[in-house]
């Protein structure tokens, strides 16, 4: 952060209020997995993340979609429907990666937060949801990664990271 680079952090679903309080002053973009929370508590969690220092707070809740809190505004995007679901492992990670890629690709030379985000955030959420849905069509890699040695071409999903 001292170098002027934005810090993004995925808190997963194992965050506590105490952990957020200790961590969020150092975080610019926070992702909270909130599938385990009722709808009202999700917005409270986003508000808490913003109060504690995150410029952008993101909450994901699987099939219920995602929410982003920025500058007092709450954005919602529905989940994209996967053509087929093989495994949801990694969908949240894929969402956050695509969300960040979209914001970075539209940032311009002035930096990530210099331009108005009111139109960039909904676009990033839509792209992130679509990418997460595509990820659900793949088997998860926990404990069973795919060897990369000798590969010369990207998979269609890897090519799609260009958004």
State each model region's role.
Residues 1-48, 65:
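Conserved beta-alpha-beta core of the PfkB/ribokinase-like small-molecule kinase fold
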Residues 43-163:
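Conserved phosphate-binding/catalytic region of the ribokinase-like
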